[in-house]
A protein has these predicted regions:
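A basic/glycine-biased coupling hinge at the interface between accessory DNA-binding modules
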Residues: 1-126, 150-151, 163
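Conserved helicase motor core of SF1/SF2 NTP-dependent helicases
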Residues: 129, 133-167
């Protein structure tokens, strides 16, 4: 659903409707390339670690600019933030989004474009979320935005199946 919403409104967030969705392997390959181009040590800047960090930030709705401006994040390894930022810039330049961008960009679109939000609030008067125990903050925020007008949301979940029980 979010991919369709983004394709229908891609120009409002600086993409074309033919944007590519990167697979996890594409993301890791891009990160490897960036680390190599920056001459960073492979053993310290592992694509899996960088990818997880980028994913976590996007799922918390933290954009690269906000991440760099955050004082808590600034206390972390500043050098690791450089490949993160370049990764996001390259994805945009390549007309691509990763799976986490689908959530982040949908949130940005609905937050910044009230006309788009109103349209989808009318279209999705009833919202059913299955496997709710596996939703993250970005997904919750989209659901909350879309349901503001009609407040007709049904969520189904099983805490015994939660993939986030370790958090």
């Amino acid at each position: 659903v979010f991919s369709r919403i983004l394709r229908e409104n891609a120009e409002k967030i600086g993409f074309t409707d033919s944007f590519t969705i990167y697979e996890p392997s594409d993301c890791k390959n891009l990160l490897k390339t960036i680390v190599r181009e920056l001459n960073l040590p492979d053993e310290k800047y592992k694509p899996n670690v960088l990818s997880s960090r980028i994913s976590y930030a996007k799922n918390c709705l933290v954009t690269p600019g906000a991440y760099l401006a955050n004082s808590t994040c600034a206390a972390e390894d500043r050098q690791a933030q450089i490949p993160d930022n370049i990764y996001c810039q390259r994805c945009k330049r390549n007309g691509a989004m990763d799976f986490d961008d689908l959530l982040l960009q949908t949130n940005i679109l609905l937050r910044d474009c009230p006309d788009v939000l109103a349209r989808y609030q009318e279209q999705f008067q009833y919202i059913l979320v299955d496997e709710y125990q596996d939703t993250n903050y970005a997904q919750y925020t989209i659901i909350r935005r879309l349901s503001q007008t009609h407040s007709k949301v049904c969520v189904v979940g099983d805490d015994a199946q939660s993939i986030y029980s370790f958090r």
